A protein has these predicted regions:
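Catalytic glycan-binding domains that act on GlcNAc-containing polysaccharides
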Residues: 36, 56-208
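Onset of an N-terminal alpha helix
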Residues: 12, 43, 47, 71-74
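N-terminal secretory signal peptides and thylakoid transit peptides that target proteins
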Residues: 5-25
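Cleavable N-terminal signal peptides
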Residues: 21, 32-33
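Cleaved targeting-peptide boundary
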Residues: 35-42
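N-terminal targeting leaders that direct proteins to extracytoplasmic destinations
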Residues: 42-56
Length: 208
């Protein structure tokens, strides 16, 4: 698909970024459990609420009772994330975005960290065999329902969509996180994916 030209098309540039970011990600073992959210019909009210969440953009920041607590969290999580993201500055920026987007969606940031580990191993340009994209493996069809054409490989865009979608599923399941996680993965009825996410959370991402 990539052409040998000095001026590359957006598709070829995206292809190059995918390859540079992690090789042949479609074959990566880290994406073995990455599934696909199932396309569904949303009520106008639900779609409106989700669109409002997607479009409400404020600068990311740590959401803690004190700056000291936030710095302790950031330092601890940065050490744990180093195996996936070697650059310290990149780790800290990513963690601030994750903590902010999860918190604003009413989700536990630690569970979201576990989910991202399972979905993409923190690879920004990960893409699954069914087309799910980015850190939280968001299916592109969601843009038609709750957003506008966006670059789902952008870290903040991906986290905003992913956290909004997971919160939607959690609401749909009346706060049952286990079932919400299965819905997020498109595998409702199977415990493999929720157990993997909750296992990653318990083993590597618990806090406090």
């Amino acid at each position: 698909m990539e052409k040998n030209t000095l001026i590359q098309s957006p598709v070829s540039l995206q292809r190059r970024r995918l390859l540079l970011a992690g090789g042949a990600l479609l074959l990566s073992p880290s994406l073995a459990l990455a599934g696909a959210q199932r396309e569904e019909t949303l009520s106008d009210d639900v779609a409106s609420v989700m669109r409002g969440s997607i479009n409400n953009v404020n600068p990311p920041r740590l959401v803690f009772a004190s700056a000291q607590e936030g710095e302790r969290w950031l330092s601890a999580m940065s050490s744990r994330l180093a195996r996936y993201v070697p650059d310290e500055g990149e780790r800290r920026r990513l963690l601030v975005n994750i903590q902010y987007e999860a918190s604003r969606a009413g989700l536990d940031p630690q569970v979201v960290l576990g989910l991202i580990e399972v979905e993409s191993a923190f690879r920004q340009y990960a893409i699954s065999g069914v087309g799910a994209r980015g850190l939280m493996q968001v299916m592109p069809f969601w843009k038609n329902y709750i957003g506008k054409p966006s670059h789902l490989f952008d870290i903040r865009t991906n986290l905003r969509y992913g956290c909004t979608i997971l919160r939607h599923y959690n609401n749909l399941e009346n706060g049952n996180l286990y079932r919400a996680l299965a819905r997020f993965n498109g595998s409702l009825g199977s415990g493999k994916y929720p157990n993997a996410v909750l296992g990653a959370w318990r083993n590597r991402w618990q806090w406090g």
